[in-house]
Regions:
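Short, flexible coil/linker elements and helix-boundary hinge sites characteristic
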Residues: 32, 40, 53-54, 96
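Positively charged, polyanion-binding regions of nucleic-acid-associated proteins
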Residues: 15-29
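Charge-enriched amphipathic alpha-helical scaffolds
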Residues: 41-59
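Long, charge-rich, low-complexity intrinsically disordered regions
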Residues: 2-14, 54-195
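N-terminal leader/presequence regions that precede the main folded/catalytic core
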Residues: 12, 21, 33-35
Length: 195
């Protein structure tokens, strides 16, 4: 009898990997769409712009090579046109962020993985909320009602902005996603965060 055939006992690592991979792909397919579907007749042009560093990369690429993007992947680029980079960098700089670093993050496709909607406002807000929550957690004062209120408000707002993340994102990126570290962990640590 093998470990996979004994109910309630160890499951073979390959079976676990297969389940995780299946759940990962299910998540991606339910939250993202093929780039070809979003780009339509402009697919070659869009792929060229991605390769040239003018448009964000797909959020995910499936094992079969399908490039997956958020349904609104081209909304911001279409709105800004040729001024996309200048517009975003100006907005990032005005918000006190490193415009080159934020532009690189945008082009990597990472913001589409993290955010429900990718706009200059949501990218900037996420960056500021991450900084705020990290600062609050570094100086944890759970008995202080002002600190508790500030943490809860920031965590709740970040929760509204962020997607759930795919099951394998932690392995994909080599780090725990912000949802785990800055939303789920504080809620697990302090019961009052969940009520």
């Amino acid at each position: 009898m093998t470990a996979t055939s004994v109910p309630g006992h160890l499951v073979a690592p390959r079976a676990i990997a297969d389940r995780l991979a299946s759940a990962d792909e299910d998540y991606i397919r339910s939250h993202f769409v093929p780039l070809a579907e979003v780009a339509g007749h402009r697919l070659a042009e869009v792929r060229g712009a991605i390769a040239a560093g003018h448009l964000p990369a797909p959020a995910y690429v499936l094992d079969d090579g399908t490039e997956m993007v958020a349904p609104d992947h081209l909304a911001l680029p279409d709105e800004a046109g040729d001024a996309l980079e200048a517009t975003l960098k100006a907005r990032f700089a005005a918000a006190g962020l490193d415009s080159d670093e934020e532009w690189r993050s945008y082009l990597s496709g990472a913001y589409a993985i993290c955010l429900r909607t990718v706009t200059p406002e949501t990218m900037i807000r996420k960056t500021h909320l991450v900084e705020d929550i990290q600062g609050l957690l570094a100086d944890a004062r759970p008995r202080d009602p002002d600190w508790r209120g500030a943490l809860r408000a920031a965590v709740d707002e970040l929760d509204e902005l962020e997607r759930p993340f795919a099951p394998l994102d932690e392995h994909r990126f080599g780090a725990r996603p912000t949802r785990k570290r800055l939303i789920e962990d504080p809620r697990e640590r302090w019961p009052w965060m969940r009520s």
